[in-house]
Regions:
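Conserved active-site motif detector
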Residues: 1-162
Length: 162
């Protein structure tokens, strides 16, 4: 079945939120954020071409300090392939997607709001993941000693069947 208007609106909202973060990063002064926050803001982005169905999202991996992920992220480099795996048995969110390395190492989860927008489309066969890769990574070893977790962003390219 086709994507519903509600599903499409939900998707467009999430794409717009990611893109707004990127635009904000370009337009606000450096003193607007705590040091270090600006570059992360700029790492988010999103676009959806309704004519072609091409979806591109740059989003932050969540939960990087749990499940031994901090250690796995030390081994990850920009451009590394990411496997986006549907995780419907997740006790916290049945819409979850896990982010794994090519070797199957767990490097986090897609943000919940994105999962909630994408999972119904994915489950109905209306979203096909084309490629996913690490677009930005800062392992905890490279961050300030006050940092509690690694930072990792993923570039996801997908096709939406209208």
């Amino acid at each position: 079945s086709d994507m519903t208007k509600e599903q499409k609106d939900g998707l467009l909202l999430e794409v717009e939120k990611l893109h707004k973060r990127h635009v904000l990063a370009e337009n606000v002064g450096l003193d607007y954020y705590e040091p270090g926050m600006m570059e992360y803001l700029a790492q988010s982005d999103g676009s959806f071409n309704e004519a072609t169905g091409e979806l591109v999202m740059y989003f932050e991996s969540k939960g990087t300090r749990y499940e031994g992920r901090t250690e796995q992220i030390e081994k990850v480099k920009c451009g590394d392939e990411v496997c986006v795996i549907r995780d419907e048995k997740n006790p916290f969110n049945r819409n979850n997607f896990l982010l794994l390395t090519r070797k199957g190492r767990d490097i986090g989860c897609m943000p919940a709001e994105l999962c909630n927008a994408l999972a119904p489309l994915y489950d109905e066969g209306n979203l096909i993941v084309e490629t996913a890769s690490v677009s930005f990574v800062e392992p905890i070893s490279k961050r300030s000693r006050y940092a509690k977790q690694a930072v990792l962003f993923v570039e996801l390219r997908a096709t939406i069947r209208a």
